[in-house]
Swiss-Prot record:
Its EC number is 2.1.2.9. (6S)-5,6,7,8-tetrahydrofolate binds at residues 112-115. Disulfide bonds: none annotated. Attaches a formyl group to the free amino group of methionyl-tRNA(fMet). The formyl group appears to play a dual role in the initiator identity of N-formylmethionyl-tRNA by promoting its recognition by IF2 and preventing the misappropriation of this tRNA by the elongation apparatus. It comes from the Bacteria. It is an enzyme of class 2 (transferase). It comes from Picosynechococcus sp. (strain ATCC 27264 / PCC 7002 / PR-6) (Agmenellum quadruplicatum). This is Methionyl-tRNA formyltransferase. One of its GO terms (molecular function) is methionyl-tRNA formyltransferase activity. NCBIfam families: fmt (TIGR00460). InterPro entries: Fmt, Formyl_trans_C, Formyl_transf_N, Formyl_transf_N_sf, Formyl_transferase-like_C_sf, GART_AS, Met-tRNA-FMT_C, Met-tRNA-FMT_N.
Length: 328
């Protein structure tokens, strides 16, 4: 029986923990997760998604504020004598002392095909950059940020209509199976770790608020990728008030092959032109069509300031938008 301690925090990490719990040859000794956070009305303390699963399975849970400087937690982890630590979206860097504790080391599941998109937000940046394929990589952790030797990979195609939430769900499903397979094969000595080539590395840094701002001078495809990559946070303005843009359709011939049948009528709007940021047409039942720096972009789903998400068509009717008005 392979003895594992799981480190993870958000919903993305939950399928990984569940896959370990369901494997007949793996024993999960306990879970390390981030401290409960105060949220919502009354500032209630809310446990992490991973902690909820751990409690449901009667697992021990440790929640150090700073694991590097928590001698009590470090002593507990040392005494567990785990074979391996499995780490997925934990949220803290692990010290060399922790990395060296388990017999087989610490294995991380990372949401990209390393060495591409090292860093905190690989799912979001792979979408923003317009990648058509991504995946999960398991690696042996070292002291660097996603620089450890690679173990196994699983590729996942990216659809033109995937947003960050959709892709996270896909990767969590494939990644959970990959992590369990990695741990079993590692224990059996069947994997040869492959060092990463630093010359091939690209980065996925922490997302900043300014990344959410839409610049209509950009092309339609670039804006579409930004909206789905940073979903549900991208912003413009409409009549001087903030407008969240949640879903778009690029009216660009190179995207036509990926249109579902329902989008076919939109192709007839491609000839429209106007000033950058201007509403050049309104597609019935869909929404406003905006002129970008290169091509047209339809706003399929939006969230006006102070309101719930709604279709672009509902916004057109609710605000009585007209051709010639400008956004941003």
């Amino acid at each position: 029986m392979l003895k594992v301690v799981f480190f993870g925090t958000p919903q993305f990490a939950v399928p990984y923990l569940e896959a370990l719990l369901n494997h007949p040859d793996i024993e999960v000794l306990g879970v390390v997760t981030q401290p409960d956070k105060r949220r919502g009305r009354g500032s209630q303390l809310i446990p992490s998604a991973v902690k909820k699963v751990a409690i449901a399975h009667d697992l021990p849970v440790w929640q150090p504020k700073r694991i590097k400087k928590d001698p009590e937690t470090l002593a507990i982890l040392e005494n567990l004598q785990a074979d391996v630590f499995a780490v997925v979206a934990y949220g803290q860097l692990l010290s060399p002392q922790i990395l060296q504790m388990p017999r087989l080391g610490c294995v991380n599941g990372h949401g990209s095909l390393l060495p591409k998109y090292r860093g905190a937000a690989p799912i979001q940046w792979s979408l923003v950059q317009g990648e058509t394929v991504t995946g999960m990589t398991t690696m042996l952790m070292d002291e660097g940020m996603d620089t450890g030797a690679m173990l196994l990979k699983a590729e996942t195609p990216i659809d033109l209509w995937d947003n960050a939430h959709d892709l996270a769900v896909k990767l969590a499903t494939s990644g959970a199976a990959l992590l369990t397979e990695t741990l079993i094969q590692l224990a059996q000595g069947k994997i040869t770790p492959i060092p990463q080539d630093p010359d091939q590395a690209t980065y996925a840094p922490l997302i900043q608020k300014e990344d959410f701002q839409l610049d209509w001078q950009k092309g339609a495809i670039a804006l579409h990728n930004q909206v789905r990559g940073f979903y549900p946070n991208c912003l413009t303005t409409c009549r001087d008030k903030p407008l969240k843009v949640l879903e778009t359709i690029p009216l660009v011939p190179e995207c036509f092959a990926q249109y579902p049948a329902a989008y076919e009528p939109l192709k007839e709007f491609v000839g429209n032109t106007g000033k950058v940021g201007e509403i050049v047409a309104i597609a019935k039942k869909f929404g406003p069509i905006i002129q970008t720096g290169d091509g047209l972009l339809l706003l399929k789903q939006v969230q006006p300031s102070g309101k719930k998400p709604q279709s672009g068509w509902d916004m057109v009717n609710g605000m009585r938008l007209t051709v010639g008005e400008s956004l941003g």
